[in-house]
Curated annotation (Swiss-Prot):
Keywords: Elongation factor, Protein biosynthesis. It comes from Methanosarcina mazei (strain ATCC BAA-159 / DSM 3647 / Goe1 / Go1 / JCM 11833 / OCM 88). Gene3D superfamilies: 3.30.70.60. This is Elongation factor 1-beta. The keyword Nuclease does not apply. Signal peptide: none annotated.
């Protein structure tokens, strides 16, 4: 088994969401077996709203990104989580 790089888009609840605090909260809930790859990047969406792009390295096993998706979705200030890309490395 190898590893998978997964890029996730995290949408905050509103333009008023504290993105600095949200980034820290996301880093604190990364599940065991997943590692943050690089920084959490802000991506402008529209009208001042910014998404957060998180790249994780996870094990290549069934359910790969699901624990991270579920953990991120439970963080206060997160509207939704979407997997943008996933590929073996």
């Amino acid at each position: 088994m190898g590893d998978v790089a997964a890029k996730l888009k995290i949408m905050p609840e509103s333009v008023d969401t504290d993105l600095v605090g949200l980034k820290e909260n996301l880093k604190n809930v990364i599940p065991a077996g997943a590692q943050l790859h690089g920084d959490i990047v802000e991506e402008p969406i529209a009208f001042g709203l910014k998404a957060l792009i998180v790249t994780l390295i996870v094990n290549d096993e069934e359910g790969g990104t699901e624990p991270a998706e579920e953990a991120f979705a439970k963080v206060s200030g997160v509207e939704n989580v979407q997997v943008l890309e996933a590929y073996r490395i």
